[in-house]
Amino acid sequence: MNKPAKWIVRHRDKAPTVPCPCGSSTRILTRADGQSVVNLHVTHIQDSRLHYHKKCNEVYYILEGAGTMELDGKKVELTPGTVVYIPAGTRHRGCGDFKTVVVGTPAIEENDEYFD
C-alpha cells in the first residue's frame, strides 16, 4: 500500500477520466492516492448498470442533467441539487443522462462492485 497522504490537492482538470459501468468517471481522489477514507469522482452517468457495493457507502450530488436513480427497485427523480445517500448493499443504478459528484466511504476498492 502507498504511504498515507498528509494532504492532497488536485484540480479536476488534472485527474484521469476513465470509462466505468455508469458512463465515464473523473477520478479526483482515490485509494491510489495513499488514503482509504474517501473517494471523490465526477461521473457522467448514461443509463448505468444495476450494481451494488459490499463495503462502500456512496453519496451522489447531481450537478447537471436529469434522470432517475433506482434504489433497491424504487425509482426517485434526479435534478441538479439533489443529494442521494446509498448505503453499502443497496442495488442501484442511474437512468438518464446527468453529471454527479460521487463520494464513497470508505474509498471504494476495485473489486467492490457487484452485478447480479
Question: Language-model features: where?
Answer:
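Short, conserved beta-strand element in jelly-roll/cupin
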Residues: 42-45, 54-69
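Short acidic-glycine-tyrosine-enriched beta hairpin
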Residues: 73-89
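His/acidic/aromatic-lined binding-pocket segments of jelly-roll/cupin-type domains
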Residues: 50-52, 57-62, 76, 92
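A short glycine-rich, His/Asp/Glu-containing loop-to-beta-strand
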Residues: 14-50, 103, 112-114
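Ligand-binding loop in jelly-roll beta-barrel domains
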Residues: 88-113
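Extreme N-terminal tail/first-helix region
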Residues: 2-20
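A cytosolic small-molecule/anion-sensing beta-strand core signal
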Residues: 41, 63-64, 79-80, 96
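Short strand-coil-strand connectors
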Residues: 70-74, 97
